A protein has these predicted regions:
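Short runs within selected transmembrane alpha-helices of multi-pass transporters and secretion channels
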Residues: 74, 143-161, 172-177, 198-211, ...
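Small-residue-rich hydrophobic transmembrane alpha-helices
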Residues: 53-113, 150-169, 277-341, 372-391
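Transmembrane helical elements of multi-pass membrane transporters/channels
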Residues: 19-38, 142, 176, 205-209, ...
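N-terminal transmembrane alpha-helices
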Residues: 8-48, 61-76, 80, 105-112, ...
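Helix-terminus/linker motif at the lipid-water interface of multi-pass membrane proteins
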Residues: 29, 33-54, 123-130, 186-193, ...
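Small-residue hotspots at the loop-to-helix junctions and early N-terminal turns
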Residues: 50-61, 136, 140, 199, ...
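Hydrophobic/aromatic residues in alpha-helical transmembrane segments
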Residues: 22, 38, 77, 118-119, ...
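Short alpha-helical transmembrane segments in multi-pass integral membrane proteins
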Residues: 1-24, 81-148, 190-245, 303-368, ...
Length: 452
């Protein structure tokens, strides 16, 4: 691929979005398998699968925090690097890249220490019971060691995609996903390691992906290269990066807080089976969210570059294509989940009681999935335009102002089935949040275009 990024400002938008989004969506589909394959295998461990799945599910708030910190730096730095490239300032773009690399390493070291020292305490606070705690601790003790691989792979891959090297970014995910899919059954069942084998497979796979990502960004084929002289942490680059990435961090870290709230409420009203079902529900949710993020990542360099280059019509056109594509995907997946919930639930468990419970919960929890496309398209466009404030407002509104209170309010209102009432909080929050986002986006998008 040519190092000339001006194709982002010249090629027809439909062809360009297809060119960039297909690899990123494929990467996210692979990433989806990467994220859920552990749970698929764990849920089918003979005799203890349901409890093991629940125990590992309680680890999700901690895993989401690790991913959130990677996204904080990656989503904060990559759009700023793209905008700098659009303005023709490659030197500044490389300084942003180097700064983000150093930030990822520093954050990963701190997270590793915290997770190794206090994961049991966290898991007990997050909804683990005496039946599931040992499965969670066994998983996290091993997963914590590979935190640096997760940080660098997830966080720095944004910079590969942001330069237009979507296929290279996809390969980084593909390497890890294939490795994980192959290693999981070998370590879980072949070596009888159970959840420890799942965790070990994950960190080995992330390590291989990390090698691929860094070899590219330190190599000669990339437009922006990590250089030693650009690794210094300077206030003028660190703070804007954190500001822009904070919206995604709020979204992902709030998912951790939400998972804790869901687990606590579900454990109270439904016990271990309700918490186990939640693990499956959030896994199925990734079928929607990760491909939608892939579409947004494909559109991000187009929107950011053309915004930096002052090409208003191309910015508007790219957003419209992103919105239509996102809405179509979300609607089709919603239909599939509503018609065949047992198919999705059966991927993660063969336990009859858990399977029957999850089928009902799935239809309730994902009842508003068809509007996810609107929320994600607007959210990712805010970030592509460098609008940190609007992104934060949208994230805070949906998660903190709407969803978390509803998790506790709904079972108090619908006492006939308090467990299912907890799940109902999700679609109600989704609908209200999308209405708010549409109003805010129309105002902020118009304001951003007026500055070009």
């Amino acid at each position: 691929m040519s190092n000339d990024r001006d194709f982002l400002g010249k090629e027809p938008l439909g062809k360009l979005l297809l060119r960039l989004a297909v690899p990123t969506v494929a990467a996210q589909l692979i990433n989806m398998l990467y994220n859920i394959v552990d749970r698929i295998y764990i849920g089918h461990i003979p005799e203890v699968g349901a409890l093991a799945l629940t125990g590992v599910g309680v680890c999700m708030p901690l895993i989401l925090i690790v991913s959130a910190f990677a996204a904080l730096v990656g989503n904060g730095g990559a759009p700023r690097a793209s905008i700098a490239l659009g303005k023709g300032d490659k030197d500044e773009a490389e300084k942003i890249l180097g700064t983000c690399f150093s930030m990822q390493i520093l954050i990963s070291l701190v997270l590793t220490a915290v997770l190794l020292l206090w994961n049991r305490n966290f898991l007990l606070a997050f909804g683990a019971s005496e039946n599931t705690i040992e499965y969670g601790v066994s998983y996290m003790n091993i997963y914590s060691v590979g935190t640096i691989f997760v940080q660098l792979t997830l966080g720095m891959n944004f910079f590969i995609t942001a330069q237009g090297f979507a296929k290279t970014g996809m390969l980084s995910v593909l390497i890890g996903a294939i490795s994980n899919i192959v290693l999981d059954p070998v370590l879980i069942f072949g070596f009888h390691m159970g959840v420890k084998g799942a965790a070990l497979a994950t960190i080995i796979s992330q390590g291989l992906s990390c090698i691929w990502v860094l070899s590219f960004l330190f190599g000669k084929k990339t437009t922006l290269r990590i250089r030693r002289e650009n690794m210094k942490l300077k206030r003028e680059r660190v703070l804007p990066t954190l500001a822009l990435g904070s919206s995604v961090f709020v979204m992902q870290s709030s998912e951790s807080i939400i998972a804790i709230c869901f687990n606590a409420s579900l454990l109270k009203y439904g016990g271990d089976i309700a918490v186990g079902a939640m693990t499956i529900l959030t896994s199925v949710m990734q079928f929607a969210m990760l491909p939608l993020q892939g579409l947004g990542q494909g559109a991000q360099p187009i929107i950011s570059y053309n915004y930096g280059a002052g090409k208003k019509d191309r910015v508007k056109g790219a957003f419209k294509l992103l919105l239509k594509s996102s809405m179509l995907y979300a609607a089709l997946l919603w239909i599939a989940v509503m018609l065949f919930p047992q198919l999705f639930a059966g991927m993660f468990t063969s336990d009859p009681a858990l399977l029957d419970f999850t089928k009902t919960a799935l239809r309730i929890y994902l009842a508003a999935m068809f509007i996810f496309g609107i929320q994600m398209a607007c959210q990712l466009t805010f970030m592509s335009l460098g609008n940190a404030k609007a992104s934060i407002v949208v994230a805070v509104m949906r998660k903190f102002i709407l969803l978390i209170p509803l998790i506790f309010i709904m079972p108090a209102i619908l006492k006939i089935n308090q467990t299912m009432a907890v799940y109902l909080a999700e679609p109600i929050a989704d609908i209200l949040a999308v209405c708010f986002t549409i109003v805010l986006f129309r105002r902020e998008f118009k304001k951003a275009l007026s500055k070009i």
